Regions:
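N-terminal signal peptide c-region/cleavage motif recognized by signal peptidases
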Residues: 18-20
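Bacterial N-terminal signal peptides that target proteins for export
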Residues: 1-9
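N-terminal secretory-pathway/extracellular module detecting exported/lumenal segments
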Residues: 22-82, 88-147
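Repetitive helical segments and hydrophobic/amphipathic motifs
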Residues: 11-14
């Protein structure tokens, strides 16, 4: 009977520890990695968001801005954005799939605006070396899943 109680206690302890351990693992995967910093902004990549889409990659990027950025909505500004970008590593270019902007830094506060683009309407931008876009592309392409 004593060994049965011990097994019950172990089973309960494992059941209670399981969700906490899983939450810690998930939190670690959702951390933002700082990839590029200038006087005006800092850009981060969520490493767990990097996925292959055909021969390209897609990743979520957070950008914090030093000064309020003008929004497409009249009279509104934002200090941070979360953008899903498509990366073409071979041609050193990237395109915005979705963007959401926020009043505060670190994606905090009221959402200001959002926009999306379909795969057939992507607007590709060059990502030259030593630029924020270039640093983002280099990081994402170096983290290629399965590669």
């Amino acid at each position: 009977m004593n060994s049965m109680n011990t097994l019950s206690v172990i089973a309960i302890a494992l059941a209670l520890a399981g969700p906490g351990a899983l939450a810690q693992e998930t939190a670690a995967l959702d951390k933002w990695q700082s990839v590029a910093k200038t006087d005006n902004q800092e850009a981060f990549v969520n490493g767990s968001s990097i996925v292959a889409v055909g021969e390209q990659l897609e990743a979520r990027v957070k950008q914090n801005f030093a000064l309020p950025q003008p929004s497409a909505k009249k009279g509104k500004t934002y200090l941070s954005s979360r953008t899903t970008y498509r990366f073409d590593c071979a041609q050193r270019r990237m395109a915005m799939k979705e963007v959401r902007t926020y009043v505060g830094i670190d994606l905090q506060g009221e959402p200001v605006q959002k926009a999306t683009s379909s795969d057939k309407n992507l607007q590709w931008l060059d990502a030259p070396d030593s630029t924020v876009f270039g640093e983002l592309l280099d990081y994402v392409c170096s983290q290629s899943p399965g590669g």
